[in-house]
Amino acid sequence: MEKREDGGILTYDGRYVMYNVLGNIFELSSKYIPPIEPIGRGAYGIVCCATNSETNEEVAIKKIANAFDNRVDAKRTLREIKLLSHMDHDNVIKIKDIIELPEKERFEDVYIVYELMDTDLHQIIRSTQTLTDDHCQYFLYQILRGLKYIHSANVLHRDLKPSNLVLNTNCDLKICDFGLARTSNETEIMTEYVVTRWYRAPELLLNSSEYTGAIDIWSVGCIFMEILRRETLFPGKDYVQQLKLITELLGSPDDSDLDFLRSDNARKYVKQLPHVQKQSFREKFPNISPMALDLAEKMLVFDPSKRITVDEALKQPYLASLHEINEEPTCPTPFSFDFEETALDEQDIKELVWRESLHFKNM
């Protein structure tokens, strides 16, 4: 194996180069050139930046090591790839490439190449950077604009949180991480771990099996308040405290707010919680603009059927200076989750991811 000056080791007759990044091996097609630097890590693995020498474009490359070792994680990877390949919107992250090695037998690690962004909303909220009302409006507008497109494709994101909203230095925002997304006409109860607790809608906390795009709107309401306040709105330590924090602000739900709960146990549980009055948003948050609070309050409604929709949210006065119906496209065709319906094992999923990677060969 020939070693290059930049530390890379040539493989497959120089068509691929192997780099060591913080002890992680990245084996990339040779068009991706250094500097190869780590820019983030998550439960799935590590993300690096590199440059595509053919387009001169900087990209982010996520390595999912041993991607097919277990079925749940493998399906999550397949779902993310299929969904993002289907979508094409300014406020949804784009997949640029999937790097696969020439030998299918060695296809164990998946490298997904995305457009490169500079930061995420979690980091911005936690920073000392001043956020004006214009910033807050623009962030919220882009989240809703992207979500309108996602919901129009019959997709629920289900894991919206500040760290899944990435930005560049122009404040352009894109929604990422679709590994937990589902179709909006699916009724099966979600079994796997979904949505960071702090952004989880009441119907999910109470295990309702019927959920809609309203779960994403709740998350957006929590994120919006976090942008405005620079701190988490409902930082529950567990499910019980999460519901308690929600009812302390919104007040105890009355019977008509619990129609969405099919389970008698869930209804009983909510009814036995201490009865509390709704707090006035304007009194509790006097430093936030009334128009912003009015919109947040319409998103943060206990009963999902009474929660504002993404289309209604875009028409609210707070976003009047940005809202332009003709500039808020929908997805031309709904996304099909058919591949979820067959009983796929790890090898089947591997084959499907391999096929997805071939689509990028001719691009």
Swiss-Prot record:
What EC number(s) does the entry state? 2.7.11.24
Please list the tissues where expression of this protein has been recorded.
Answer: Expressed in roots, stems and flower buds.
Q: Give the matching Pfam families.
A: Pkinase
Any idea which residues bear Phosphothreonine here? Answer: 191, 196
What keywords is this UniProt entry annotated with?
ATP-binding, Kinase, Nucleotide-binding, Phosphoprotein, Serine/threonine-protein kinase, Transferase
Transmembrane regions listed in the UniProt entry: none
Q: Which InterPro entries match?
A: Kinase-like_dom_sf (IPR011009), MAP_kinase (IPR050117), MAP_kinase_CS (IPR003527), Prot_kinase_dom (IPR000719), Protein_kinase_ATP_BS (IPR017441), Ser/Thr_kinase_AS (IPR008271)
Its Gene Ontology molecular function terms? ATP binding; MAP kinase activity; protein serine kinase activity
| KO phenotype (gene knockout) | RNAi MPK13 displays fewer lateral roots.
Look at the named UniProt entry and state the broad enzyme category this protein falls under: transferase
Its post-translational modification remark reads:
Dually phosphorylated on Thr-191 and Tyr-193, which activates the enzyme.
**Can you give the residue ranges of the Protein kinase domain?**
33-319
Chain span(s) of sequence motif TXY: 191-193
* Database matches in SMART domains: S_TKc
Q: What does it catalyze?
A: L-seryl-[protein] + ATP = O-phospho-L-seryl-[protein] + ADP + H(+); L-threonyl-[protein] + ATP = O-phospho-L-threonyl-[protein] + ADP + H(+)
List this protein's GO terms for biological process. Answer: lateral root formation
Active site as annotated? 159
In this chain, ATP is annotated as bound at 39-47, 62
Q: How is its activity regulated?
A: Activated by threonine and tyrosine phosphorylation. Activated by the MAP kinase kinase MKK6 in vitro.
- PTM Phosphotyrosine: at which residues? 193
| PROSITE patterns, per the entry | MAPK, PROTEIN_KINASE_ATP, PROTEIN_KINASE_DOM, PROTEIN_KINASE_ST
Describe, as the record does, how this protein assembles with itself and its partners.
Interacts with MKK6.
Domain comment text? The TXY motif contains the threonine and tyrosine residues whose phosphorylation activates the MAP kinases.
Family membership = Belongs to the protein kinase superfamily. CMGC Ser/Thr protein kinase family. MAP kinase subfamily.
Q: What does this protein do?
A: MKK6-MPK13 module positively regulates lateral root formation.
- For this entry, the protein name equals Mitogen-activated protein kinase 13
Task: Look up and give the organism this protein is from.
Answer: Arabidopsis thaliana (Mouse-ear cress)
Classification from the root reads: Eukaryota, Viridiplantae, Streptophyta, Embryophyta, Tracheophyta
